[in-house]
Amino acid sequence: MAKVIKINLIVNKRMSPAIILIGVLILIVLFVIKFNSSEVSSILTSEVTSEGDDEHETETRETTGCISQLNTLRATLAAKKKELKTLRTARKKECTEQLAKTQAEVDRIQAKIDNFSSRTKIVPLPGGEVGPPYNPPPPRTNTRPNPRPNPRPAQLPQLYNYGYY
């Protein structure tokens, strides 16, 4: 009985770092599962802002906020353009006032988008999403060094007078 208790204590002392590590990993996985990835990233960026350079972090947050705001503006613009198209096809006397109001809203939203894009230098991506400006990778260079000349050229084996001088 005493040997079993001693063995358990030894195993527990040796395994405690591994058990703690496994427990921490399980907690991290549960944390990530519980929250969405966007919430986790916002929590992580808020922790970084308290530690790091405030100007750079606020600029990053403003850029991501600008991107989401710009995407919502574009979505509302598309909806207003659809509404404008349906009003133009109707062309009744009652719709004239609504048509003018919707056209003014479309122009205002388009001006906001243009102002936004010029201020933040946001480039539309091929899928219609908006992302940061694209910087192409630098051109590839030859990474292998120039081959050095062989100091000793290879000699053919001397088959006929091998061992004879």
From Swiss-Prot:
Q: Which UniProt keywords apply?
A: Coiled coil, Membrane, Transmembrane, Transmembrane helix
Q: Where does this protein have compositionally biased stretches of type Pro residues?
A: 133-154
What does the record say about its membrane topology? Single-pass membrane protein
Give the transmembrane ranges. 15-35
Could you tell me where this protein is found in the cell?
Membrane
Q: What GO terms fall under cellular component here?
A: membrane
> Where are the coiled-coil regions?
67-119
User: What name goes with this protein?
Assistant: Uncharacterized protein 084L
